[in-house]
Amino acid sequence: MELQKSPHAPGVRPVKIHCRDVGSGLPVVFLHGGWGYRVYPINRQVKAFGDRVHFLIPDRSGYGRSEKLSGQMPADFHQRAAEETLLLLNAMGIERAIFWGHSDGAVIAAMIGLSAPQRCARLILEAFHFSPRKPNSRSFFKQFAVHPDELKEKTQRLLAADHGEKQWRKVVQRNCRVWLKLGAESTRSSDDLYKGRLSKLKVPVTFIHGRGDPRTEPGEIERARKAMAGADMRFIECGRHSPHSEKACWRECNEILGEFFVGK
């Protein structure tokens, strides 16, 4: 698929977007995290629900088989990615869907909910980020912003398979650096990625969150819950950053997803 242009790929025309299109039935758009799709894939969910769910899994520009990008990511990349996603769905003729976002993808899904609620049957926000400040992750971001080759070999293989041997390091570095930038530009501990707008969300929201997520700051999810008092919050006790793909808890994650994917 080619977009005439995308705010997530400034200066590039046209913009090539690769989208996996699997299954049939209820449209569900899965929005991957900041390192791309194949590190945390939804293979088990496709297998479990593919006979009743039409999964659309786009690679954002800069990722996977979509348009290659260079240079630093802008601080408002989540909003830009939300706009790109809607442009893609317009081109595909998808008017309304469940948006399931993981990590950075969950931020993007929430921003779609704010800007285009009529397009959203539900938001499923997994491994959600609320704060731009991540002091407990700063050393993680600093390490891999400079030394991506220090990642585990398995992770490197998955990244290379997704983005290519020449590109995967750049993907990791761009994402780590923009999170460091977000933290540096935040002036108050009360800052959030949504500029105080989450309470204005008018679509059904379900959080899926691993209790042991290392990218979550103390009190961060509680702040998100307070901002969205009516949201459905599901903690997975054994979960870390990607409950849907973790061996210990993907089944529990599927039970939750099945509430929204079965019989719709």
For the regions a language model picked out, list residue spans one by one:
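Conserved HGGG/HGGXW glycine-rich cap/lid loop of the alpha/beta-hydrolase fold
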Residues: 15-68
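Short alpha-helix in the alpha/beta-hydrolase fold that links the catalytic acid
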Residues: 43, 194, 203, 217-226
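Active-site loop/oxyanion-hole signature of alpha/beta-hydrolase fold enzymes
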Residues: 57-97
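Flexible "cap/lid" loop of the alpha/beta hydrolase fold
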Residues: 107-115, 120-152
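Active-site nucleophile elbow and catalytic-triad environment of alpha/beta-hydrolase enzymes
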Residues: 177-197
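Short beta-strand/loop motif that positions the catalytic acidic residue
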Residues: 201, 207-209
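Acidic catalytic loop of the alpha/beta-hydrolase fold
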Residues: 212-216
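Catalytic histidine-centered segment of alpha/beta-hydrolase-like enzymes
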Residues: 239-254
